[in-house]
């Protein structure tokens, strides 16, 4: 239905899938709260997250905050490298976007792609749409960039000229593709797909289907994946057990055995080049001035704990086509 963003028509309903995936949806809440806390004590600037996520009363551990800083920095650097290579003549698909604020941050830096898509569970999308409707700081950029009188919107979807948010299950490729095409996704534009702690909650077959669809659907594309790695050791097993206690199963953990298994899953899904580094490597490559700044924010008692945590998460990226754009040259 067509509706004004200022007076949108919202409907709320839950499907059996929403209920079954409650544990996975809970990880969205956890990650959002951790990011909000890190922003609140100065790790990085984000004026938008406060309008989407509540501030936790519970202080987060320094190693968690530094881990999120490295995650945000790493994904941001690769994203901006893609935008520079394509001169923003591209589109971005943020898979499992949650309460992510990248669209608004990129607009502030004059780095918006031709269109930015977010996809997540319908219940998460409904919640985010509610915040967008209520907060002018979030809605105004969407309206300012919109070229028509009305926006396409319902409780699980918003489609505007430069931004779309879609409620969909990433395990249902046919439904996902149909909804994206309704929102004018182009298979001709260079496309960046981003997944942060998303594939690990899918079975290996389900994530392979998504990766193959992404590799086969676009003439030139890049995929950024942030998730667990080295999960076969004792530390990894403790992480798995902790999540299971919260009714959250890492269905795809077998592809998180090593950096090599992460690269291989991308190459075997049709991507032409693939790289993977653990987050300790990302942290070690941070600009020295930034490291000094963030390490002054909080005292970290045991560096070993940070290293253990960072060695169990990784940043992976893969490219397909786009040789004339130099996509293969993108690295962290």
UniProtKB/Swiss-Prot annotation:
Lineage top rank: taxon: Eukaryota
EC number: 2.1.1.233
InterPro entries: LCMT1, Ppm1/Ppm2/Tcmp, SAM-dependent_MTases_sf
Enzyme class: transferase
Gene Ontology cellular component list: cytosol
Binding site for S-adenosyl-L-methionine: 71, 96, 120, 169-170, 196
GO molecular function: protein C-terminal leucine carboxyl O-methyltransferase activity
Entry-linked Gene3D superfamilies: Vaccinia Virus protein VP39 (3.40.50.150)
Region of interest (Disordered), ranges: 1-23
Catalyzed reaction equations: [phosphatase 2A protein]-C-terminal L-leucine + S-adenosyl-L-methionine = [phosphatase 2A protein]-C-terminal L-leucine methyl ester + S-adenosyl-L-homocysteine
Keywords associated with the record: Methyltransferase, S-adenosyl-L-methionine, Transferase
GO biological process, one term: regulation of apoptotic process
Family named by the database record: Belongs to the methyltransferase superfamily. LCMT family.
General function of this protein: Methylates the carboxyl group of the C-terminal leucine residue of protein phosphatase 2A catalytic subunits to form alpha-leucine ester residues.
Record-given protein name: Leucine carboxyl methyltransferase 1
Taxonomic path: Eukaryota, Metazoa, Chordata, Craniata, Vertebrata
């Amino acid at each position: 239905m067509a509706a004004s963003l200022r007076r949108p028509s919202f409907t709320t309903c839950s499907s059996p899938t929403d209920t079954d995936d409650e544990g996975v949806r809970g990880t969205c809440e956890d990650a959002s709260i951790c990011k909000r806390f890190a922003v609140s004590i100065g790790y990085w600037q984000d004026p938008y997250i406060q309008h989407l996520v509540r501030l936790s009363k519970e202080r987060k551990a320094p190693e968690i905050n530094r881990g999120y800083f490295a995650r945000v920095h790493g994904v941001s650097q690769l994203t901006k490298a893609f935008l520079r290579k394509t001169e923003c003549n591209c589109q971005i698909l943020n898979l499992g976007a949650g309460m992510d604020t990248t669209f608004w941050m990129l607009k502030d830096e004059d780095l918006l792609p031709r269109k930015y898509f977010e996809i997540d569970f319908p219940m998460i999308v409904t919640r985010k749409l509610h915040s967008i409707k209520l907060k002018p700081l979030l809605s105004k950029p969407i309206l300012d960039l919109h070229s028509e009188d009305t926006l396409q919107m319902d409780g699980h979807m918003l489609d505007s000229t430069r931004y779309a948010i879609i409620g969909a299950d990433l395990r249902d490729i046919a439904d996902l593709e149909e909804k994206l095409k309704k929102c004018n996704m182009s298979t001709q534009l260079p496309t960046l797909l981003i997944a942060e702690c998303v594939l690990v909650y899918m079975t290996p077959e389900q994530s392979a289907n998504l990766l193959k669809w992404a590799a086969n659907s676009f003439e030139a594309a890049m995929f950024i994946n942030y998730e667990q790695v080295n999960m076969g050791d004792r530390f990894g097993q403790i992480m798995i057990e902790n999540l299971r206690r919260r009714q959250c199963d890492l269905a795809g953990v077998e592809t998180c055995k090593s950096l090599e298994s992460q690269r291989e899953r991308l190459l075997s899904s049709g991507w032409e080049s693939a790289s993977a580094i653990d987050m300790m490597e990302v942290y070690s490559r941070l600009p020295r001035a930034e490291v000094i700044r963030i390490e002054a924010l909080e005292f970290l008692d045991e560096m070993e704990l940070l290293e253990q945590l960072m060695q169990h998460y990784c940043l992976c990226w893969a490219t397909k086509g786009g040789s004339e754009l130099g996509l293969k040259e993108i690295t962290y």
